[in-house]
Amino acid sequence: MDFMGYKPRFLDTEMLCQRLRECGALGVKSVMFAGEGEPLLHRDIAHIAETAKSAGIDVSFTTNGVLLKEDLAAHLLSVTSWIKVSCNAGTPESYSAIHRTQAEDFERVMDNMAHAAALRARERLACTLGFQCVLLPENVEGLPELARRARELGADYLVVKPYTRNPKSLASNYDDIHYNKYRNLAERLADEERKDFRVIFRNGAMRRWDLRQSAFERCLALPFWVYVDAGANVWGCFRHLGEESFRYGNIMEASFSDIWQGERCRSNMKYCAEEIDVSQCHVTCRMELINIYLWRLRHPEAHDNFI
């Protein structure tokens, strides 16, 4: 998230583990390590993941995969529900251009995921391994190759999803992209599917991006999630990072229970459920499908009671 600045900051391990144990006792179901930076850069990430799992919390990662080396994978796979690698290209050259990194990192990622898949099979672990790719004009032709590589190295799936942009983002390169012309790509990618490998082409999300229309009028999803940034701040929404009214508190300064049950959290959720203008939110946000479902529950349409 470029608008937050790429700051070399890390959550304190002891504090984070304490908060994870609190979250487990409170009934938090899952945690995904991802966000403004690369989660595997944290030197204690294996211990943190193990702590979350032992607290009864399901663990997942979204990562670029460059640091998912064999020794780290051996610790993570046994306590993790799924690991998803963000890879927006099918060749080293396009990977280097799109990710703004060395071309060698592409093969490093592929090797790391292959080792992880082999480890999973050898140890009979249950961790799901997959790739996700943002569909861009620059990577369209390389996606069949990416699907093939992912399948052959032992991944379970490849997700192809639309570009989305937080309104605060400093970059606007793809704001005018339209996905209607890429619909036939789904059929090409389906050729790579097998019994144990799926290509998930997010047609619905692409249509919603093209139409820029929302099927709900308020945000009802906030009681079901929070985002904790690397500065330990607890936020209600990606769209409003940096806005004080959406900052519930800081886990360095208060327990998660005190923050979650605090007045700032309650008042913000009430505002979002009753007043917020979702037309100012970004299309295909993480909470979009949850909001569509919850809005329909609150505002049923004709014949919804029939199976």
Give residue ranges: language-model regions.
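Radical SAM enzyme [4Fe-4S]-AdoMet core and its adjacent flexible, acidic
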Residues: D2-E14, R21, A25, A55-S60, ...
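Glycine-rich beta-strand-to-loop/alpha-helix junction loops that act as flexible
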Residues: M32-G37, N64
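Terminal, non-catalytic domain-edge segments
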Residues: N291-I307
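Short, well-ordered alpha-helical microsegments
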Residues: H42, L68-E70, V140-L143
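Active-site-adjacent substrate/metal-binding segments within catalytic domains
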Residues: L16, L20, V31-M32
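Membrane-interface junctions of multi-pass transporters
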Residues: Q213, H240-E288
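Aromatic-lined substrate-binding rim segments of carbohydrate-active enzymes
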Residues: R43-D58
